Amino acid sequence: MKKPQDSSFAVQRRSGHIESTRYWKLSPAEPMGADCAPYPQSTADREAIEEAAALLREGSTVAFPTETVYGLGADARSTAAVEAVFAAKGRPSDNPLIVHIAERSELDGLVTEVHPSAAALIDAFWPGPLTVVLPVLPGVLSPLVTAGLDTVGVRMPDHPLALALIRAAGCPVAAPSANRSGRPSPTLAAHVLEDLAGYIGGVLDGGAAGVGLESTVVQVQPDGTAAVLRPGGITAEQLAAVLGPGAVTSAPAPAVDVAAGAPGPSTDLAEAPAAASGYSPGAAHAAGDNSPAPRAPGMKYTHYAPRGALGVVRGASAQRVAEAAADLLQAAQRAGEITGLLLFEEHRALYPANAAACVVSLGSLASPEEGARSLYAALRRFDEAGATYILAEACPDTGLGLAIMNRLMKAAGGTVVDAG
């Protein structure tokens, strides 16, 4: 019998607790919505899933692919297991976790009620990239999962491998993104290993995540309206198509720090980009430590950030944005910075050929799905290039563009360059 491909990905001990992180390479599996076929199909894949599920049952942590990003899973009922997730990520304990289930019937054992509007959204978008915040059933989940709140975010992923793992584990799986806190979320198993090898029990490699951004998080109010706490793979327009016009509201946008009123070498971002270039896990935790626990992940802290300083450039036209960004990048290069530019393909010709040391495209503005799918990998590309000063073009904040801009603004810590 063919053994599952298990290289027992040996790494130097870094956490003091896990000397090696197990690694399984599985057959690719595509999301298929409600008609998702059973998985795994091969004996090798089935054995790998069972071994990973056994780790979860034993209280260990396993990274696995979903249609959004790779998640770091643990038994949501076990405080010790959930503590291991927080420790591996360096995640602040007041940041709640999303619970993943494989069957809708499992909701009955986790929450006290499901509002009819929430049920309508679940019917429309599960399995899929939608997390619904619901009143938690006391005493079932570890209190660390909910960060002491009386609600819990639950979703059913649209990925055969993820569903197979949850079913095999036989428990609700708490799973934030499988990266160090504050870093870009992982869309490949290689990203997980880059951040967490030696900190976690295992990684199931199922190929690239399809959506590329985390799930949309919504909370239905008593009047039936839905508040979007975090934009994601399901757009506000899609939610409104189910609940009706005017029934969807958004949480407040991240605070904005306008770094450049008029673009040029004299701006703060150009003068001292290195001030924010060093990544520190604690830096993402510093802001807002005394504020209440967020109702959903991604609401309180800096997230998704590359190691270099990042600013988002916006303006009245693509030409103005390109001119402002080019001026700032040239000034940064003269100051000795390694520069990066994140742009959309339609605007590439507006920049000089040597606009930055590392230029990465998010594809076409006409295909926001492509931009969403490649955003986190693009931010990691800048790290690979050693970029210390990065500028990213803004995009329209409609449809999926709202989620892209949410992630960019979080990654930039709210720093905006206003090109006028």
Question: What are the residue ranges of the model-derived segments?
Answer:
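Active-site-adjacent structural elements in enzyme catalytic cores
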Residues: 2-420
